[in-house]
Regions:
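Conserved donor-binding/catalytic core segment of Leloir-type glycosyltransferases
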Residues: 2-29
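Nucleotide-activated donor-binding/catalytic signature segment of Leloir-type glycosyltransferases, i.e.
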Residues: 54-72
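Short alpha-helical donor nucleotide-sugar binding micro-motif in glycosyltransferases
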Residues: 71-72, 79-84
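Short alpha-helical segment that forms part of, or immediately flanks, the ligand-binding pocket
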Residues: 78, 96, 101-105, 119-120
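Aromatic "clamp/platform" in nucleotide-sugar-dependent glycosyltransferases that forms part
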Residues: 92
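Short hydrophobic beta-strand element within catalytic cores of glycosyltransferases
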Residues: 109-112
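Conserved acidic donor-binding segment of nucleotide-sugar-dependent glycosyltransferases
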Residues: 124-135, 144-149
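C-terminal amphipathic helix plus adjacent low-complexity
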Residues: 164, 169-236
Length: 236
């Protein structure tokens, strides 16, 4: 079990902007530091919210507990991540959290907002999901700190699992499966496609979308007449 006196380090690596949920971080950090006197933050990244983080640190007198390292070069990402025990992500939108994969591969336990494709990235045992609000982030981070302190987190085991999940071989297999499913989907007729466009856009927007698509189809027909597809060399 990790001794209670050991400082727990939470790492943040993000573009410091609104979309990345830095406003949530500005609220969560003082609350977490007040609850855990032995907590330390290392925040990497640059952006328009950097000044606000500095102001928050000064307001709550956390200069010795919140380290703002600025922009982190790609070659230094691993060194930045391995300074901590927990990785905190507060994004408001995220399609695929590359930084989360990097953090788990570096052995960090993850606390992240439940947005976009993040819930599908990793097994529940490797991360805690929070709704994008400061109360939920503080609550899940509290739980993560307790989890790490109890010695239940195994960084080396986690690294091995993630390395297998996101190896090139595994990634290629999943990508091939996506293409295979797409190829099995029967092509839609032009009429059906226009009907779907009209339904999606509503009474006015649907008509505009259909007009734009019709112009695009006519443009393709003209280009195909000028440069027939049969005259093009296809890639192997």
């Amino acid at each position: 079990m990790i001794a209670d006196a050991l400082t727990v380090c939470i790492v943040v690596l993000s573009r410091l902007m609104y979309r990345k949920g830095i406003d949530l971080l500005l609220t969560a950090i003082p609350r977490l530091c007040a609850k855990h006197p032995d907590l330390h933050f290392v925040v990497g990244g640059d952006g328009p919210k950097f000044v606000e983080l500095e102001q928050m640190r000064e307001k709550h007198m956390l200069q010795d507990r919140v380290e703002l390292v600025g922009a982190v070069r790609q070659s230094d990402v691993r060194a930045h991540l391995t300074r901590g025990h927990i990785f905190l992500n507060t994004s408001l939108t995220e399609a695929f959290g590359t930084s989360i994969i990097e953090a788990t591969c570096a052995g960090l336990y993850v606390v992240t907002t439940r947005v976009g494709g993040i819930p599908e990235l990793l097994p529940p045992s490797m991360m805690r999901l929070a709704e994008p609000c400061d109360d939920a982030i503080v609550r899940e981070t509290d739980a993560a700190i307790a989890y790490v302190r109890a010695g239940r987190h195994d960084p080396l085991k986690q690294h091995r699992v993630v390395a297998r999940m996101y190896s090139w071989d595994a990634t290629v297999r999943r990508l091939e499966a996506v293409y295979a499913r797409a190829m099995l989907t029967p092509p839609r007729s032009t009429t059906e496609r226009f009907r779907r466009y009209a339904d999606a856009g509503g009474p006015i927007g649907g008509k505009i979308i259909c007009m734009v698509i019709a112009v695009q189809i006519m443009l393709v027909m003209v280009l195909d007449w000028l440069v027939p597809t049969s005259s093009l060399s296809l890639a192997p």
